């Protein structure tokens, strides 16, 4: 006799509801998991534009104010019209003016490039134009139309640009909107070109126009205006508090998510020309230099080797990577003994970065280490801040490890 298999009893709707909940949770986790990657895609494409613009602008300043010795209070155009320059010097000054103008244009394209590539990362190449348009409107917003009761006339006014905040919001929204429309709007094959070259671009452009004018520009402009007001009111103290916060967030996880978030904030202020990126750039290199230095001085200071054998060559590697702008060389030290490494390099990064900012070091160009050092204002002070932070890091980690070793809480295999 054949044995009939019993089928499992299925409760109608139960499995479907469970699957729906599971899919909803997966989509939420997928959204928040993928979003940082999309943002970093935009930042990585924006940085070369900023560097190109920054380097060319730096050429103009070096030629005009270092080579030709123009007084700092005089602009390049004023120097051209002064009649004091002729021949080769006049040609150099014309080139400086061209470099200044062209570099400024490149800087203006940084935020649109960021928004375009964030949208492209989310919604594909169909979302690229919408992101670019949104980024451009975040820096060059549409004039506001107002009715003046006193004159009974319509007039326009210039809103506060939403800049990086607006570009971030519109690029994400536009990217997902284009992605959704591309999936939902199904047309016959012979209308595919119409969909991709006309319908989706027009719909996304209209959406960007309305969203930027009525929502994002007012919101982002309000935030930017508030930030500028607070920083202006706080003056030097506000800049120093910002430097301390950015340095701490940059150093704490050595290239991890907190570091990336700090980079996002620093880039937004730098591209808006509100605050320079000095503190972040210094805080990137201090931890690996300081921990590498600790492996060199530990025996000289204490008479003992306080690191495991494999960390000594890694210390030299970390120092080399630091000069390339890579902080991840310090990760082995943080993993091996977080209680000694993390407080040490955080204190060093905060003190070194804040000291450099306080003493007048300024870096507007969004790169770190040797790639940006030639473009730093007050480079001597900047390097002194790095040295101070690295020395503090090295001394702290050496004496913390010595204290833990004496208490029997640290085992070392290189004695």
Swiss-Prot record:
Q: Which stretches are Cytoplasmic in the membrane topology?
A: 1-46, 123-126, 179-197, 259-276, 340-341, 400-415
Indicate where this protein resides in the cell: Cell inner membrane
> What terms describe the molecular function in GO for this protein?
protein-N(PI)-phosphohistidine-sugar phosphotransferase activity; protein-phosphocysteine-sugar phosphotransferase activity
Q: Name one GO cellular component term.
A: plasma membrane
Q: Where, in residue ranges, is this chain on the Periplasmic side?
A: 68-101, 148-157, 219-237, 298-318, 363-378
PROSITE patterns reported for this sequence: PTS_EIIC_TYPE_2
What is the predominant subcellular site recorded for this chain? membrane
Tell me which Gene Ontology terms the entry assigns under biological process: phosphoenolpyruvate-dependent sugar phosphotransferase system
Q: What residue stretches are annotated with the PTS EIIC type-2 domain?
A: 35-415
Q: What are the entry keywords?
A: Cell inner membrane, Cell membrane, Membrane, Phosphoprotein, Phosphotransferase system, Sugar transport, Transferase, Transmembrane, Transmembrane helix, Transport
One Pfam family linked to the record: PTS_EIIC
Bilayer-crossing residues are 47-67, 102-122, 127-147, 158-178, 198-218, 238-258, 277-297, 319-339, 342-362, 379-399
How is it placed in the membrane, per its record? Multi-pass membrane protein
PANTHER family per UniProt: FRUCTOSE-LIKE PERMEASE, FRUCTOSE-LIKE PTS SYSTEM EIIBC COMPONENT-RELATED
Q: What is known of its domains?
A: The EIIC domain forms the PTS system translocation channel and contains the specific substrate-binding site.
Q: Give the protein's biological function.
A: The phosphoenolpyruvate-dependent sugar phosphotransferase system (PTS), a major carbohydrate active -transport system, catalyzes the phosphorylation of incoming sugar substrates concomitant with their translocation across the cell membrane.
Q: What is this protein called?
A: Fructose-like permease IIC component
Q: Which organism is it from?
A: Shigella flexneri
